[in-house]
Each structure stands twice: as C-alpha cells, then as structure tokens.
Amino acid sequence: MTYKLILLRHGHSEWNAKNLFTGWVDVDLNDQGRAEAARGGELLVENNILPDVLYTSLLKRAINTANIALDKADRGWIPVKRDWRLNERHYGALQGKDKAQTLAEYGEEQFMEWRRSYDTPPPPLDDNSEFSQAHDPRYADLGDALPRTECLKDVLVRILPYWESDIKADLKAGKTVLVTAHGNSLRALVKHLDGISDEAIAGLNIPTGIPLVYDLDDDFQPVKPGGTYLDPEAAEQAILAVANQGKK
C-alpha cells in the first residue's frame, strides 16, 4: 500500500514581495499569491489528486492559500487541522528586516549562516518588538515553548512529533493528506522524508503555490525521492527565484 501526501507552500505574500524576513509575522497573500493558490487547486483537479484532510499552520498566508486552493478543487468541506508546529521558522531579530539590507550589513557569510544553516539561529527577538508574538492570543498556551528565534533544526524538532502523532495517523487511515505550510516548515518535513543531510538541506528550496506530491511506502519512505511537483517546469523556475532572495 502507498500513502499520498501533498505539500503546498503558501502563495507569494506581501512581505515576499517586499523581500522582508517574515517568520511568525502574520502577513497576508498578495495578488500573485492568491493566483498561485488558485493554480495550485487547479493542478490538484487536473491530476485527480484530491485531499481528504487539510493541515495548516496558524498563519493566514497558509490558511488563505489552503482555502483558495480547496475552493478551486471543490474540497472546501474537508476536515481542517491547524497547529503552530507547522508555522514558519521563527526568524528572531531578523523578522521585519529587509533581506538585501541585512546581507549588506552583515556580509554574505553571516547572512547565509542565519538564513540557511541547519543549526545556527539568528539573534532572539525581544518580546517588546512590534514583530513579536509574545502577546499574541493564538499562542497563549505555549508558555516557555514559544520561540524567540529558531534554526531549521528547531523547526524539525517541533514538527516531527506532530508528524508522528497526527499527520501520519491520517495517512495510515488511507486519507490523502494536504499540508499547506511554509518554506522552512516544509523543508524540515522534506528533510525527514528524504533523509537529507544537515549540510545538503541548505540547498533545498521549495517554491510557492505548486503542489509537491509524495507517494510513501509501508515504511513511510518516498517511492520517488524528492516527490513530484505537479508543474515541474514552473517549480524549477520558482526554485531559482527563491534561491536568489536577498541578492537584489
């Protein structure tokens, strides 16, 4: 038996367009992102891959991407599970900062270490910052678990228990699962699925709005490592654009 998992990074956001570090700041999609989300839903229909259950983060850019895609696929009625553990990586004190300015200020080596290394987080975000989530009611129950900064390793640590307890359980029940989340939370999950090394994960980019489908075997190993993008040509072009963020 194989299990079907669909990963969908949220569409282009207002801060993607402004080239800002976003993290846990709850910005919305822009027009491009809404169009990407709609196209993502159309791709699901065209390939007859329709989800039975949806997982999203608590951030509106992922929630709205899922809503638009599911509306296009006429699957707005499926069960929805939202959890903070699918949130984007917390970028600490970099949240709200311009990527190009950060690159110019700190140099490429430090910039890339913060942005792409597996285990080096940026400096923590002060709770009094306008970009802090310390007083956000959706995280009121987290207590000390609320991050002030994260590296990709931290994201993997929070996602894996949720993958094991919830997402995998729905897959085992024979459901086609859609996870609509973020660049780094999805990179962490793909790292686990594909067994990508701590070093190689730095080179993995996930494009916005293009469904990535994994067929998993009985041991939850990918039948095809890396999965399959439902629009491979668009994915290749978009991956290059993601890789070049901050260099303009």
UniProtKB/Swiss-Prot annotation:
GO molecular function: phosphoglycerate mutase activity
Active-site residue numbers: 10, 88
Annotated site, Transition state stabilizer, chain positions: 182
CDD domains xref list: HP_PGM_like
Catalytic reaction(s) noted: (2R)-2-phosphoglycerate = (2R)-3-phosphoglycerate
Annotated positions binding substrate: 9-16, 22-23, 61, 88-91, 99, 115-116, 183-184
Biological process, per Gene Ontology: gluconeogenesis; glycolytic process
Enzyme class: isomerase
Keywords: Gluconeogenesis, Glycolysis, Isomerase
Protein family (similarity comment): Belongs to the phosphoglycerate mutase family. BPG-dependent PGAM subfamily.
Cross-referenced PANTHER family: PHOSPHOGLYCERATE MUTASE
NCBIfam families membership: pgm_1, PRK14115.1, PRK14120.1
Record function comment: Catalyzes the interconversion of 2-phosphoglycerate and 3-phosphoglycerate.
Name under which the protein is recorded: 2,3-bisphosphoglycerate-dependent phosphoglycerate mutase
Chain's gene name: gpmA
